[in-house]
A protein has these predicted regions:
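A generic structural signal for ordered secondary structure
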Residues: 13, 29, 38, 92-96
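Conserved HGGG/HGGXW glycine-rich cap/lid loop of the alpha/beta-hydrolase fold
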Residues: 18-76
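Conserved acidic catalytic loop of the alpha/beta-hydrolase fold
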Residues: 86-104
């Protein structure tokens, strides 16, 4: 049986405006110089959980998590207008550009 890595806290958080009225909550954990990995939570509605930070070795990976439109700490909460697959892809690209990441592993 595999176990998760130890609990960690984010070293940076961001609030990223995307298509109005949505603002995404984004956080970074682990090694700022590590291999970038993006965690995608299920949805709509749930958001990521703190234990989701623990899937990857924080010494090796730059772990990026964000709450999708209407979920978790993103605002407005439970607002699903404009929550489409194409919008999600656009939001993921906006997060990647915000953080200056060229390529990353996508998990979720």
């Amino acid at each position: 049986m595999h176990t998760l890595f130890p609990e960690i806290q984010p070293y940076a958080t961001h609030h990223l405006p995307v298509a109005a009225p949505h603002v995404l909550y984004v956080e970074e954990c682990g090694n700022p110089d590590g291999l970038p990995v993006l965690f995608l939570h299920g949805g709509p509605g749930a958001g990521f959980q703190p234990w989701n930070r623990r899937f990857f070795d924080p010494e090796r990976y730059r772990i990026v998590l964000f709450d999708q439109r209407g979920a978790g700490k993103s605002t407005p909460h439970a607002h699903l207008e404009g929550n489409t697959t194409q919008a999600l892809v656009s939001d993921i690209e906006a997060v990647r550009c915000l953080l200056g990441i060229d390529r990353w592993v996508v998990f979720g």
